[in-house]
Amino acid sequence: MTVTVDEIVQLRVGGLPVETARDLASPGALEWAERVLGARARVAELREGASDQLAGHVRGAPDGLRKELVQIRRAVFNGRRADRAIAALPTGLAEVVAAVVEPVRRAEAELAELEAAGRTSFPDWLVGERRRLASLLEDEDFSDGLAVAVPGAGRSLRAYPRKGVVAVPNKQMRKCERSLMSYAMRAAAKASPFSTFTPTALTSFTAGAPGWERLPSRPRRHSRWSIYPVARALGGLREDRRRLQGLPLRLSRTVQPRSDGGLDVVRSVYEYKDSDRGEDYATCEQSVVRLRQSEVCRIVTDLLGEGTLVFETVVAGLAERAGLTRERAGEALARLVRLGLVEVDGLDLHPHTAHRAGTARRILCAAGDDDAAGLARALDRYEESASAVGGTTGAERERAVARVRDAVEDLYEIAGLQARPPRTVVYEDCALGRGVYRGPALRWSEEECRALGVLATLLDPAQTDRALMRGYFVQSVGEGGRCADVPGFLRSFDADLYDSHKTRTLDPRAATSEDPWLRWGEAWRWEEARRALTSLIEAGEDELDLLPVLTGDSELLRGLDLPRYRYRHLFLFAQVLPEGSAGSLVVNRIFGHAGFGLSRFAYMHGPEGARVARDQEERARLSGVRLAEVSGGAAFTNLNLHGPLLGTEIIQPGDPGGSSAPTRMDLDGLVLEDRPGESRLALVAPDGEEVQPAYLGYLVLSATPLPTQLLALLAPASNVTTSFVPDLPEGSGPRTLPRVRIGSLVVRRRTVQVPTALLPEPDPATPEGYPEWVRWWRDAGLPERCYVSLAGRDGMPPGKPRYLEVSGLVNLAASSHEWRGQDGWLNVSEALPDLSETVINREDDHRIHEMVLGFDLTNPVTEGAVS
């Protein structure tokens, strides 16, 4: 097996200096809180000691004094004054008792003085942090990013320096503050994508060390519309017969005749649901529509059998042949459009051309209908207004974003949609050119890369599905067999096995080897291996190295039939660590699909951006493999927008039109074959060349249509997921998960899990509440600087981590507001690397960065299977 690291890597650079995180903290407040806690502990210790001494006097006192001494003892222990009671004691005894109590009183006085000093200083600490937070609005890049990320909040943000920089802001300013703090931490301490907060850049590795010529001081900006409103407006046309006038129709590409004369249509419908958060998200609802044999279906399929016809032409033909009125024929045809047998040609958006609405505008203009023409003009206004945002700044940018939102509202109104625009109506990407990179050199070994490949396969839940598919193939076609009807095989696999399997919930306590579904292809072995790995990483105490169990004939891998791919490319998001640190690099969690590493921002970097994919394509060709893109279905989110990065695309039934790939292969023309020596299935072209599907979008595969998900099972796992943090069992107390590594590669930071039910009640932004939070933080063993994510009991994955320093009063208050009342737990991870350890230095401006690293694992055909 050969390892080849990509020559070009992507950097995601922080949008604010790392010093910002330290500026938004108050070390003096933390020092004061710790002194208060120390003083309180000292007082408690002295009270207990004094109580023990007074107990001796109580035992030896005559009956007439015992009651008074008991009351004095209780008062001292509970922190109440007892001066009068002590003075009333007999001479001699009063002096003895006073001497016992005096150290307690001195310590209590010191504590009271310390607490009073904190109450005096606390408003200054809060105002100081808020003043520094407000000063970030003077950073043009950050402020402009907020205008796009938080549209409509401009007035509140502008008011924050005047109304929010106080000891106790009002409710509106606190809400504004929480949003501002969230984006400040995201920009300064975590290279989060998709905004002006974190521009991207390209660099290359030469002889193992990164080289970068010159980093410009300002990023290039490019704004474009969100295609979510576009897809929603165009998708709504099929629901209204009146809006079908003049539009071209075609038969669905997923129609399958049945033996009884009826038709089956695999229909994919995107459901757009408004949410309080204004998320631009849709779910792909897939179903098989079974149409019985009917005269109307026969006539329509005959009419559209030769190609596309406009709606009125099909209505006229149907009315004439079926003896229907035009009205009834139109209703019948509109119903077939809704059922999916007939589709509007050219209105579905392909990732290659969706940024220009594909062919939709041309089709709408050619329809000859006033509503269609009005919709085309609305699309023009939306695109023009969104494109203009990138060239604006300050107050003009706020007005520009407002105009974009107005354009979306007009678009929805013209399309007849009763819906609210999403929160994000314009996307802005920023890029830096090549520059001087002064980060640490890359120091990983080939053995570690190979182990990462094994881990990626082991952790990928789809590996169980790959085993199921191969088991089904061997059973239905035969071991080493070939199947020429690939779409038919995928449909049968889904109908007979996969669909039922995916709707089940596995009992984590049951023996997987006895599960009848998991016996196909011995898929149960992968489930068992994942369980064993989970047990292994949960059992470790301080640090766990997985390298020995991911190489050789380890017990964990024994019995697994690891697939051998002739060419395989993996992505990981990582931060390189300096010499002498905890390792060579830290692998970060990937939110989404790693194909975005070479697609999402490629257009911002010109020919070099496309070279990342072209280099992979050439290396795959040398290994006898052709990489071929799969579209991921109709585009409805900017997460999947990209130009044609590979030379070939596989066209599946139901794919959107608009592909710009130079070469297009119909899935119908490929062959699926079993390769027992490589323990996998492979797609093969007619000339014998292996074709490896490559989904290049960022949207997670589970959100794409089922055909894409099934086809992706014929490709290897393409990223190294680091979801090593298991759920905290319900009813459990805090627990610490060890740091996990593969040799020098850290794949999980040391993490403490704490139930939200144990969070302190007081407000940390008060002198009374903050020491309680510091005490709780220390008692729970949480690091002073950390990344915190909230996980719930709702089955959803944990949210994105947020950088937090316990000395940051405002940040802690904003975070605790998010955690309060949630049923779940916090994942508190060590801040590795420290913010000062992995930075880009630019004219005394230090920025955190994250690398999108890629590498190949290739197996020559002559080698034996890896196991």
Predicted regions and their residues:
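Type-3 copper protein
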Residues: 1-224, 329-634, 796-867
